[in-house]
């Protein structure tokens, strides 16, 4: 059958949970037996978020094919349990870049290039391509930003046109809004929702479903009022309450028949979603009997979205061992030799995540040394793996001044150096070693035991790599290179002997973790952290 298209927009304010709503609907439709793909359009002019500050954007989520994308793609992958691609995150910058390249090639035959039709046609092509290349029954597209933003207008015009292109029975518009509660008046207010829908309708888009974000139950008379003023069916006003766990949201939406409303509108004849496994997950999450305290020593801890996938992967591992994860966010710049014990002695495990730049580096190295010397379970990711190598070289081998060439180009001992193919690269954007690469694991190591396989595939995002000139010297001192590229040239995983669990990877294992299938390194890290309590 031809693909069906669902467009998710947002109004009133940002951060309403459009991404979670879209991902939850995707899960419900998948569990009805439909093949679902999902994408996000971001209105900013950056080509991708790869060079944006985490303070501006949160984490950069990396797909199998190496796309640097919005963190909402992490929600999509975790909820729907699918692997997405570069076609799943499109920015204004990418659209305009493509249009300008076509203009330079002469593809427009000398015509005047305009927002309509050239930019909108390019946007529509990205929607249709997502369905074509995946063979999806349903394509869900989230439009970033808020209705009324000037940056979003070309995207909204494009999705308006798609209804004419494919027929109204093949398109559904879902609009997310806010119903605020005014504490002083003791009232909930629907007026912002009405005005948001009025703005959307002025652009030619009539929503079929309205999902209202709310702190408390919405009275039926208010839902009826929204339906009347926004010209939708009463049952198509759906509530999205604040939930104790994100994974409750699909069940809340199913309880209000959202997926059935969508299927009826799109004329999809499919069985009811079987959410038994999902209900078991939510029940498990709600009744965890243990508690594990993990210290994340990072550079951007003030904005926890910068490490969103790391935190989620820890929680997934916790679900597996029946443990609630209590995260201590430790600001790396504040860690030093004098206070490291005070900051970290309550942690059952210590994690140093990825990052770029030299701020907070010495604090991270101090935390790594503390974990190694005090036998605290440790997991390092990307930069965390590189700094674990530097710490070992400095402390155990006595190589004073050892460092990464990224952080100190004049270091006498460049334990971490540029990948050979990166030596002459000048552009920062899109030039890292990105995406899925194989890793061969050594027999008899913690990493091999965790995965239970010799060759695994993980996602990468780095420019620097372990310097093989120091490999033999560090191996003799008890440093284990437990994972490498299949040709043995690139170091992928390191470990330390005589330690309950000290493992660090050059790749980013957090990106492939799922709530029902925790990533192996995270699972073993949390399991060892729990065991350390005893």
From Swiss-Prot:
Cross-referenced CDD domains: CTPS_N, GATase1_CTP_Synthase
Binding annotation for UTP: 14, 189-194, 225
Subunit structure: Homotetramer.
Protein name: CTP synthase
Any GO BP: pyrimidine nucleobase biosynthetic process
Lineage per the UniProt record: Bacteria, Bacillati, Bacillota, Bacilli, Bacillales
Reaction catalyzed: UTP + L-glutamine + ATP + H2O = CTP + L-glutamate + ADP + phosphate + 2 H(+); L-glutamine + H2O = L-glutamate + NH4(+); UTP + NH4(+) + ATP = CTP + ADP + phosphate + 2 H(+)
UniProt keyword annotations, A-Z: ATP-binding, Glutamine amidotransferase, Ligase, Magnesium, Metal-binding, Nucleotide-binding, Pyrimidine biosynthesis
Enzyme class, first EC level, given as a word: ligase
Binding site for Mg(2+): 72, 142
Role noted for this protein: Catalyzes the ATP-dependent amination of UTP to CTP with either L-glutamine or ammonia as the source of nitrogen. Regulates intracellular CTP levels through interactions with the four ribonucleotide triphosphates.
Similarity remark: Belongs to the CTP synthase family.
EC number: 6.3.4.2
Residues annotated as domain Glutamine amidotransferase type-1: 293-534
Binding site for L-glutamine: 55, 355, 383-386, 406, 463
Note: CTPSs have evolved a hybrid strategy for distinguishing between UTP and CTP. The overlapping regions of the product feedback inhibitory and substrate sites recognize a common feature in both compounds, the triphosphate moiety. To differentiate isosteric substrate and product pyrimidine rings, an additional pocket far from the expected kinase/ligase catalytic site, specifically recognizes the cytosine and ribose portions of the product inhibitor.
Region (Amidoligase domain): 1-268
Organism: Shouchella clausii (strain KSM-K16) (Alkalihalobacillus clausii)
Metabolic or biological pathway: Pyrimidine metabolism; CTP biosynthesis via de novo pathway; CTP from UDP: step 2/2
